[in-house]
Amino acid sequence: GYDSEEGTEIIEKTLKFITNAAYQASATLAGEKGPSPIYDYENYMKCPFIEEALNDQTKQTIAENGIRNIAIMSIAPTGSISNIVLSYKNGNKNYIGVSGGVEPIFATHYTRRTESFKDDNRFYKVFHSTVQAYIDQYDLQSKIDELGEEGDVESILPEFLTRTSHKIDSRRRVDIQGKIQKYIDHSISSTINLPEDV
C-alpha cells in the first residue's frame, strides 16, 4: 500500500526517475537553445536540491549544456482535473480518473442515487477508475452486487486498493511527503485527511 515501506520505496524511486528525466530534458533543451540567462553553473550546482536529487548523469548533462529552466518540478492541485484523465485502457473500455495529487485516492467508491418521478429511487456504487478496473479485470462485479447496498465492498478488494487517503496515519503521511519533497523543487499541493477525533 501507499504507506508501506515498499510503497514509500516505489514513490521515491519513481520521483527520482521523473525528476532526473525532467532535468535532463531541460539540459538537452539548453544545449539546443541555450541556457537560462540567469543560469550560473558554480552557484547552481551548489544548491542542496541539485546535490541530493540529481544523479551523476543528469549533473553531467547540466555541466555540458547548462539548464534551460531554473525550476522544473511541482505537484499542482488536481482535485477535479484528476477525474478527466484517462488512467487505464483495457480493450474497448476506458477508465477515467487518477489520484488527485501525492495522496492515494480519497475513497474506493461513493454511492449515487437516481431520482425518479415514480418514487423508486435507486442507489448504486460508483467506483474510482482504478478500483473499477480491478473489479472488471478480476470479474468481481457479481460478488459486489451480492453484497447489496450496505455490504462491505472493501472486504473483497486487496488491501493495497483500500488504503485510501483517510486511512493513512497523518504523521506517516507527512513523512512520505517529506520524502517526495526531496525530488520537487517547487511546491506540492497536498491534502492531509485527519480523523474526526484530532
Describe the function of each predicted region.
Residues P48-F49, T61-R68, M73-V198:
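Catalytic alpha/beta core of large soluble enzyme barrels
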Residues Y2-T78, L86, I156-L157, I188-S189:
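Internal maturation/activation junctions in enzymes
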